[in-house]
């Protein structure tokens, strides 16, 4: 059993720890959480509790196919991280660098069209309506000097 154990497994261009359970190891890939990882493994027919180091090459290939197009493999559209993409209108699940690039493009689009959210991003202020009087302060604090008596 130990002869086919791998300490590091490469899935979707990312090295994952072979000593962890597969569902937790997949969360090391940016864009994949524990719930989505469990869904992918259930669709692939892989035990989520087995160690990632015991995955075969066929199982890794199956996981990568599902990650490439999860909706086509039966994962519901509400579980993906990019439903109804702005440019294509498709339900997609982005991982690794593609996720970072898409997020950056979304913020830049909001800045370009001068949307309220884009302006808040530019100014480095909270975007989702939080209060700013006491939180989101930057820099060092300036104390109040006491008046001489």
Swiss-Prot record:
Keyword Coiled coil attributed = no
Give the GO molecular function terms. rRNA binding; structural constituent of ribosome
According to its UniProt entry, the protein's GO biological process terms are:
translation
Keyword annotations of the record: Ribonucleoprotein, Ribosomal protein, RNA-binding, rRNA-binding
Classify the source by domain of life.
Archaea
Which function does this protein serve? Answer: Located at the top of the head of the 30S subunit, it contacts several helices of the 16S rRNA. In the 70S ribosome it contacts the 23S rRNA (bridge B1a) and protein L5 of the 50S subunit (bridge B1b), connecting the 2 subunits; these bridges are implicated in subunit movement.
NCBIfam families per UniProt: PRK04053.1, uS13_arch
HAMAP family found in the cross-reference section: Ribosomal_uS13
Q: What is this protein called?
A: Small ribosomal subunit protein uS13
Look up and give the organism this protein is from: Thermococcus kodakarensis (strain ATCC BAA-918 / JCM 12380 / KOD1) (Pyrococcus kodakaraensis (strain KOD1))
Q: Which lineage?
A: Archaea, Methanobacteriati, Methanobacteriota, Thermococci, Thermococcales
